[in-house]
Swiss-Prot record:
The species this protein was found in: Caldicellulosiruptor bescii (strain ATCC BAA-1888 / DSM 6725 / KCTC 15123 / Z-1320)
Key words of the record: Cytoplasm, Elongation factor, GTP-binding, Nucleotide-binding, Protein biosynthesis
Binding site for GTP: 17-24, 81-85, 135-138
Localization per Swiss-Prot or TrEMBL: Cytoplasm
Name listed for the protein in its UniProt record: Elongation factor G
Ranges annotated as spanning the membrane: none
InterPro entries membership: EFG_II, EFG_III, EFG_III/V, EFG_IV, EFG_V, EFG_V-like, EFTu-like_2, G_TR_CS
Gene3D superfamilies: 3.30.230.10, 3.30.70.240, Elongation Factor G (Translational Gtpase), domain 3, P-loop containing nucleotide triphosphate hydrolases, Translation factors
Length: 691
């Protein structure tokens, strides 16, 4: 089956916004007008097509980015709907990485909200061209021009209106197209019937003013238009469109449109703008990667004639077909049933079926081509961020960076039956989400799950219950402390049992020394002259490591210690591996008590981005959390504060920051190093732990 749509007529776009700007409703309307859905879903009724996980329908927020294909005016548009909540930034990062362009949706009343700033910065990082859509023009307090000002101030963007609204709040009834200088008035409720008329008197002046602003903005980016504009020559609609397209793709401007998706007004012009101004896969630079054999940089152009390469950007478990791997094909062709090479893992895999996804139903295809987004079934070893390619022309594409999880809670199954299912459920969920990690606490045997925030873990537990029918009890969030020593000591350990029959005899002298942070554990054997036979040395090492699993202060793991075995003795008959293990473990515990043991805590590298006016409050708050401020810089028109703060002090920070900055501050944090806990705080922790 040959390609249905030429590459130039393909658009891979994302719809990104702050929570509640009306992003999912906008996607719904797009699917309705492009003929993919026959009845529109409403988010507040819980029937929106893109929100197909049960939790999303209940909470009315989008958690995973569902990928959908639709058609408009002879173009294929692949849409990825992304979540707007800060705990799910991994979903946004991962979809932006594989998109060519995006629609940024803003609420006409709220304008540029905190998550819009975060998402905008992520899109800047991946250089994704955007058009902006000011939604909810029909609500109280809607102000289109105000949003444009906010985009300049808060995002440092260059927004250029290509439409102005006719009426606002409950009188909003249409838009003026500033390219054709015609009005589009909506007649029916579904917005399918619209009339093109002359511009109504009440908006004539503002339309003229913004037409001039549009021409000036375009002239600044295009030499030919500049000349025509200055000489007062006529600039055709076609010339304007071409110049706006070029400036948008080069990230010199962001065209701004308006509408009310819920009232079905302004959605078709938005679709036209996607086709007119956002890039096709041909318009973007060739994708770069490196050769797994030589390490040299290679690139692949977006073309079917190039060797095949694709990036796996999302894994999903589907109740009917099992594991779905979402792929962005950058070059070449992939046929269903063929073999591909996973260059990240150095493994060959067979692709069973290839699907084009609609939000919740799917269509099988024989092949996918450069520029396509699709889902594959049958890739068992592939995980998020892996490169798939032609084995004869291997390439590894730049993977995605995912932050380390920062919060962990203990979970336990409610019943014996839940226990078996829990392991499978956790493995599946960890496969899907690179920011979700599972581990076991060796002392308590508890299962710990770690993620990006409390909502993130809440939803994971919720999904375990619904999708895998596993009920679990959840503990409180906790910090992973460790223990170490501050001075060197020499210590003797003896384990002797000699009361009839075969006895036990182990005797060691150890020296314990502190090492620098992050050095781990070192074992040095200085036995000479065979005072302890060679075969017992590994047992001494094993005994020490066993004792290090649980420190003397509060049972936390011990790190950064060098242990030297320098003397001891043995018995011809009674010495054994077990005896030396026990002697070494006793010696280590004894020695650690004398070596000035201390508690270590994880220190996080925190970056807080806040508008200037909240800076004093936020810095004061960081200091009160035992934070050390490292530096500040201006980014756009926000202040960036960099600091090191103990993880123990960061619980609940998201909520505090939100209230201190009226929701405009955002922060990221990642683990940096371990550091000694101040004595007064260590005493409190030990008191709690040893109760």
């Amino acid at each position: 089956m040959p390609r249905q749509f030429p590459l130039e007529k393909t658009r891979n776009i994302g719809i990104m916004a702050h929570i509640d700007a009306g992003k999912t409703t906008t996607t719904e309307r797009i699917l309705f007008y492009t003929g993919k859905v026959h009845k529109m879903g409403e988010v507040h009724e819980g029937t929106a097509t893109m929100d197909w996980m049960e939790q999303e329908q209940e909470r009315g927020i989008t958690i995973t980015s569902a990928a959908t294909t639709c058609e408009w005016k002879g173009h294929r548009i692949n849409i990825i709907d992304t979540p707007g909540h800060v705990d799910f930034t991994v979903e946004v990062e991962r979809s932006l990485r594989v998109l060519d362009g995006a629609i940024a949706v803003f609420c006409a009343k709220g304008g540029v909200e905190p998550q819009s700033e975060t998402v905008w910065r992520q899109a800047d990082k991946y250089r994704v061209p955007r058009i902006a859509y000011v939604n909810k023009m029909d609500i109280m307090g809607a102000n289109f021009f105000n949003v444009i000002e906010m985009m300049k101030e808060r995002l440092g963007a260059n927004p250029v209106a290509i439409q102005v609204p006719i009426g606002k709040e409950d009188t909003f009834r249409g838009i003026v197209d500033l390219l054709t200088m015609k009005a589009i008035i909506y007649v029916d409720d579904l917005g399918k019937v619209s009339q093109e008329t002359d511009i109504p008197e009440e908006v004539k002046d503002i339309a003229e003013e913004y037409r001039i602003k549009l021409l000036e903005a375009v002239a600044e980016t295009d030499e030919e238009i500049m000349v025509k504009y200055l000489e007062g020559e006529e600039i055709t609609v076609e010339e304007l469109k071409a110049a706006i397209r070029k400036a948008t793709i080069n990230m010199q401007m962001t065209p701004v449109l308006c509408g009310s998706s819920y009232r079905n007004k302004g959605v078709q012009p938005l679709l036209d703008a996607v086709v007119d101004y956002l890039p096709s896969p041909v318009d973007i630079a060739a994708v770069k990667g490196f050769s797994p054999d030589t390490g040299e940089e290679i690139e692949r152009k977006t073309s079917e004639d190039e060797p095949f390469c694709a990036l796996a950007f999302k894994i999903m478990s589907d109740p009917y077909v099992g594991k779905l791997t979402f792929l962005r094909v950058y070059s070449g062709v992939l046929h269903a049933g063929s073999y591909v090479y996973n260059s990240t893992k150095n493994k060959k895999e067979r692709v069973g079926r290839l699907l084009h996804m609609h939000a919740n139903h799917r269509e099988d295809v024989d092949a996918v081509y450069a520029g396509d987004i699709c889902a594959a079934i049958g890739l068992s070893n592939t995980t998020t961020g892996d490169t798939l390619c032609d084995e004869n022309h291997p390439i590894v594409l730049e993977s995605m960076e995912f932050p380390e999880p920062v919060i962990q809670v203990a979970i336990e199954p409610k019943t014996k039956a839940d226990q078996e299912k829990m392991g499978i459920a956790l493995q599946r969920l960890a496969e899907e989400d690179p920011t979700f990690k599972v581990s076991t606490n060796h002392e308590t045997g508890q299962t710990l799950i770690a993620g990006m925030g409390e909502l993130h873990l809440e939803i994971i537990v919720d999904r375990m219950r619904r999708e895998f029918k596993v009920e679990v009890n959840v503990g409180k969030p906790q910090v992973a402390y460790k223990e170490t020593i501050k001075k060197s000591v020499k210590v003797e350990g003896k384990y002797i049992r000699q009361s009839g029959g075969r006895g036990q005899y182990g005797h060691v002298w150890l020296e314990l020394e502190p090492l620098e942070r992050g050095a781990g554990y070192e074992f040095v054997n200085k036995i000479v002259g065979g005072v302890i036979p060679k075969e017992f040395i590994p047992s001494v090492d094993a005994g020490v490591q066993e004792a290090m699993q649980s420190g003397v202060l509060a049972g936390y793991p011990v790190v950064d210690v060098r242990v030297t075995l320098f003397d001891g003795s043995y018995h011809e008959v009674d010495s054994s591996d077990m005896a030396f293990r026990i002697a070494a473990a006793q010696a280590f515990r004894e020695g650690m008590k004398k070596a000035d043991p201390v508690l270590l805590e994880p220190i996080m590298k925190v970056e807080v981005v806040v508008p200037e006016e909240y800076m004093g409050d936020v810095m004061g708050d960081i200091n009160s959390r035992r934070g050390r401020i490292e530096g500040m810089e201006l980014r756009g028109n926000a202040q960036v504060i960099r600091a090191y703060v103990p993880l123990a002090e960061m619980f609940g920070y998201a909520t505090d920051l939100r209230s201190k900055t009226q929701g405009r501050g955002t922060y990221t944090m990642q683990f940096d190093h371990y550091e000694e806990v101040p004595k007064n705080i260590a005493d409190k922790i030990l008191e709690m732990k040893n109760k």
